[in-house]
Amino acid sequence: SAILIVLVVSLASCSNRQTGEVSVKEDLIAKQLLQGIWVNDETEMPLMRIEGDTVYYANPQSAPVPFKVVHDTIYIYSNEPVAYKIDRQTEYSFWFHSLADEVIKLHKSENAEDSLVFTSREVEVISTTPEVIKKDSIVTYMNTRYRGYVYINPSKMKVFKTSYSENGISVDNVYYDNVIHICVYEGKKMLYGQDITKKMFADIFPAEMLDQAILADMNFMGVDSKGYHYQATLGIPESSVYNLVNMIIGFDNTMNIEKAE
């Protein structure tokens, strides 16, 4: 029983590592057996190609990820590291337990045409804003008319978001973030202007959330005695999860940022 307790504690300490790292030596023979293209037994469709230390998925929107094999487990070092228990491994078959507790059964491809699925090494980055979006609003405060502008600009800054297939396989999709320009005018006179990125919200959101979010939207809310009011939307791509951020720019052009309640 003493040996069992030590083993349980050892496994718990390994699984608690945030990066999914394991301290024991990886199985290089098992890794060598995994080299090649693997096809789903049920659909006969290529699922992934393993080359060296990297898994390449058939879906061109899924980013390649490094991996290791330790004992009977394959560790995938994606944006959110995961581990799959290996149920069966031979030179031509590979079965593993998905996160949905399904046994994924694969066999090694012997069809040369399957390699065509993996011809492109470039990941297809998903654009959340295909073109510049312009918005403007007019408000009146203390008998003065103010016009607030918003320009939502697509950028080349990449956001990696982990998603899961119906059968419980984790993949990283890549999206382009936005840079949003805001400015306030009184007549033809610009009172304030600045480019906004999600990095400006690092003090009010945890890094884990901010890393997978995009700066999705911005609205000019009005003017009062405190200054010019904007509200930003931070969203997780292809989900209903979002957070609102209130931004107040004082008449001295100092900005106050706080999470909307």
Question: Which residue ranges define each predicted feature?
Answer:
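Short beta-strand elements that form the blades of beta-propeller/WD-repeat-like
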Residues: 94-96, 146-149, 226-236
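Surface-exposed beta-loop interaction hotspot
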Residues: 102-162
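C-terminal motif of bacterial Sec signal peptides marking the signal peptidase cleavage site
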Residues: 10-13
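Surface-exposed loop and turn segments in beta-propeller and other repeat-based domains
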Residues: 191-210
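N-terminal glycine/threonine-rich, aromatic-flanked beta-hairpin/loop signature
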Residues: 40-83, 171-188
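Edge beta-strand at a domain terminus
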Residues: 20-24, 101-129, 238-261
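Bacterial signal peptide processing site
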Residues: 15-18
